[in-house]
Curated annotation (Swiss-Prot):
It comes from Rattus norvegicus. Glycans are attached at residues 113, 259. TPR repeats lie at residues 205-238. Belongs to the P4HA family. One of its GO terms (cellular component) is endoplasmic reticulum lumen. Its EC number is 1.14.11.2. Keywords: Dioxygenase, Endoplasmic reticulum, Glycoprotein, Iron, Metal-binding, Oxidoreductase, Signal, TPR repeat, Vitamin C. It comes from the Eukaryota. This is Prolyl 4-hydroxylase subunit alpha-1. Its cofactor is Fe(2+); L-ascorbate. Residues 411-519 form the Fe2OG dioxygenase domain. The gene is P4ha1. Disulfide bonds: none annotated. Pfam families: 2OG-FeII_Oxy_3, P4Ha_N, TPR_P4H. It is found in: Endoplasmic reticulum lumen.
Length: 534
């Protein structure tokens, strides 16, 4: 390929407004049932075609026997009045019936069903979203392409493999997004599987075409040249590869000339020593976030761990919890993160999920510039809002939060239910509005988000932790539990250590619901202090 002269282009159709199946595992399960219905319809069509062919075969066998007998003595055969009548009948009527049978389209029912179902099919946005989710999981959990291709993921119940064609398609998605790092990884995986003898509709020439370009874009000219030569061994007439071979050799020649003319003796130059490992505390946030998602990173000292306790909590002598107090566990000290165990029943969870499912839509975030809600690539999930007036269970859950936190829920936001899709995540963010976002919650008129209550409504096979990169805390999903923390100090100042994230779901289905409690109504429940950081 002559890059800049000959460029490969992959044009995807424009995506129309679409529900975005890839953002919700819950809605993707509906697709499984839809596909099962289509398979049943397809099998019915195949059976109808087989029955039709069986009838035609019987006709052919009968007529073969009849004509074989008739052709031995044609005059004698038609000399029989019955044979003469039946010959007229066959040619005038029965062959027409056979023609109608052959022309009968047995696919009408299947095509009609397929047409109806197709309007609910995923589109290009979903396919690209699912592919990018695989890339995200690959990076976050340090998974190599071969591990993913072989289906060797932790906690999987149903092992699934990727074909060379699948790997090629993933590489093409990365290419379309100008993500040449993942293009290289997945094209190399496709090439490896082809070289191992896997039968595929994809050929090595096509894979090498993309692979050499991805490698070139990342600055590895030597490897790009090597791959181009390998492509030309398979297809010496490949026009783009021949052009690119000349281009690569020209660029390499220019670089060699530039190196020769460079001043100074290369042998006298000192090599720059490699940087030593950086302490975890000083790693950029993205690295800390990914390490915490993998269960690595900062570990709490034994001295701090001794300050964490489990206890029974009665909600400050609340009558509802005196005889059956809530089980409370300290997950972290600063910020203080508390987990409540067995705080929501399976029956309540199912009711909340059933209420939320019909109205799940792509989760939104507050745009700091406009103050309005908008979708974002760093939040991949679907959510729905439930009011306490809709169902007694929702009202009961709201009151339980009030009883256990001591905070007024009348000024809180509605219960938000979220279901995470393939690689579903919510990258590091604050729940509270910062000083440069004065209008974030102005429409609500209830002040800033003072605290967050988060229910875990499912177990997750792998991944899906809630992590706090600033302090190194990781809280893992456990069905029936909830975690609680304050976003603001008692002074009303934001606690920046509460910056947190929802790690990508590696395997499984993650359901959560959260309640954001606001400042209004808490004046006497959580009095303001004079110290800014208390």
């Amino acid at each position: 390929m002559i890059w800049g002269v000959l460029m490969m282009g992959i044009l995807l159709p424009q995506c129309s407004a679409h529900p975005g199946f890839f953002t919700s595992i819950g809605q993707m399960t509906d697709l499984i049932h839809n596909e099962k219905d289509l398979v049943t319809s397809l099998k019915d069509y195949i059976k109808a075609e087989e029955d039709k062919l069986e009838q035609i075969k019987k006709w052919a066998e009968k007529l073969d026997r009849l004509t074989s007998t008739a052709t031995k003595d044609p005059e004698g055969f038609v000399g029989h009045p019955v044979n003469a009548f039946k010959l007229m009948k066959r040619l005038n009527t029965e062959w027409s019936e056979l023609e109608n049978l052959i022309l009968k389209d047995m696919s009408d029912g299947f095509i009609s069903n397929l047409t109806i179902q197709r309007q609910y099919f995923p589109n290009d946005e979903d396919q690209v979203g699912a592919a990018k989710a695989l890339f995200r999981l690959q990076d976050t959990y340090n998974l190599d392409t071969n591990t993913i291709s072989k289906g060797n993921l932790p906690g999987v119940k149903h092992k699934s493999f990727l074909t060379a064609e699948d790997c090629f398609e993933l590489g093409k998605v990365a290419y379309t997004e100008a993500d040449y790092y993942h293009t290289e990884l997945w094209m190399e995986q496709a090439l490896m599987q082809l070289e191992e003898g896997e039968m595929s509709t994809v050929d090595k020439v096509s894979v090498l075409d993309y692979l050499s370009y991805a490698v070139y874009q990342q600055g590895d000219l030597d490897k790009a040249l090597l791959l181009t030569k390998k492509l030309l061994e398979l297809d010496p007439e490949h026009q783009r590869a021949n052009g690119n071979l000349v281009y690569f050799e020209y660029i390499m020649s220019k670089e060699k000339d530039a190196n020769k003319s460079a001043s100074g003796d290369q042998s006298d130059q000192k090599t720059t020593p490699k940087k030593k490992g950086i302490a975890v505390d000083y790693l950029p946030e993205r690295q800390k976030y990914e390490m915490l998602c993998r269960g690595e990173g900062i570990k709490m000292t034994p001295r701090r761990q001794k300050r964490l306790f489990c206890r029974y909590h009665d909600g400050n002598r609340n009558p509802k919890f005196i005889l059956a107090p809530a089980k409370q566990e300290d997950e972290w000290d600063k910020p203080r993160i508390i987990r409540f165990h067995d705080i929501i029943s399976d029956a309540e969870i199912e009711i909340v999920k059933d209420l939320a499912k019909p109205r799940l839509s792509r989760a939104t975030v507050h745009d700091p510039e406009t103050g309005k809600l908008t979708t974002a690539q760093y939040r991949v999930s679907k959510s729905a809002w439930l009011s306490g007036y809709e169902d007694p269970v929702v009202s009961r859950i709201n009151m339980r939060i009030q009883d256990l936190t001591g905070l007024d829920v009348s000024t809180a936001e509605e219960l938000q239910v979220a279901n995470y899709g393939v690689g579903g995540q919510y990258e590091p963010h604050f729940d509270f509005a910062r000083k440069d976002e004065p209008d974030a919650f102005r429409e609500l008129g209830t002040g800033n988000r003072i605290a967050t209550w988060l229910f875990y409504m499912s177990d997750v096979s792998a991944g899906g932790a809630t992590v706090f990169p600033e302090v190194g805390a990781s809280v893992w999903p456990k069905k029936g539990t909830a975690v609680f923390w304050y976003n603001l100090f008692a002074s009303g100042e934001g606690d920046y250590s509460t910056r947190h994230a929802a790690c990508p779901v590696l395997v499984g289905n993650k359901w959560v619901s959260n309640k954001w409690l606001h400042e209004r109504g808490q004046e006497f429940r959580r009095p303001c202090t004079l110290s800014e950081l208390e």
